[in-house]
Amino acid sequence: MYSAPSACTCLCLHFLLLCFQVQVLAAEENVDFRIHVENQTRARDDVSRKQLRLYQLYSRTSGKHIQVLGRRISARGEDGDKYAQLLVETDTFGSQVRIKGKETEFYLCMNRKGKLVGKPDGTSKECVFIEKVLENNYTALMSAKYSGWYVGFTKKGRPRKGPKTRENQQDVHFMKRYPKGQTELQKPFKYTTVTKRSRRIRPTHPG
């Protein structure tokens, strides 16, 4: 004969079902949070305070610095070259940046063919890049509009087209350097040492 399940068996089944539901909810929350972060990384933020920094980008491949020569882009600039001084505006908390040549006031952009070009107006999404700090301490710049396309240069300092670049290629690796003679801008963050607060002794008053 068929025997009804015991109360203990029912409780165990309910417990297992509850654990499964909790795991499903946790997985959904993790996916939703990851999607939220990715969306925020790609979305421009007009509320947060933008930061403007001045530095050079040293190309690991060419051994020189990125230059914004008007509409033409290269990586042949010497240390301190006026065309290699870049004004970098942080666009969002997700490390989106816009890069402008200080001398020419043209923006570094990547067009739909993956070619690096300079533009006088940097409001287009083609002029926004996602800054990635790599494990080797180099920085890579991926196009915010064309995912997977990176700013890259050959050994001769010529721009590489976006579709031919990958994050692990040395061609897309850069090192931030402050302009020659302006080392005072490179100030390390200073930590304040907090000492243990001494106990306050109250003065005694005669009764």
From Swiss-Prot:
- Indicate yes or no for the key word Electron transport: no
Q: Which residues form the signal peptide?
A: 1-27
Q: Which Pfam families match?
A: FGF
Does Zinc appear among the keywords? Answer: no
Q: Would you kindly state one Gene Ontology biological process term found in this protein's UniProt entry?
A: positive regulation of angiogenesis
Q: What keywords would UniProt list here?
A: Disulfide bond, Glycoprotein, Growth factor, Secreted, Signal
Where would I find glycosylation on this chain?
N39, N137
Kindly list the cysteine pairs connected by disulfide bridges: C109-C127
How does this polypeptide assemble, per the annotation? Interacts with FGFR3 and FGFR4.
The protein here is known as Fibroblast growth factor 18
Lineage summary: Eukaryota, Metazoa, Chordata, Craniata, Vertebrata
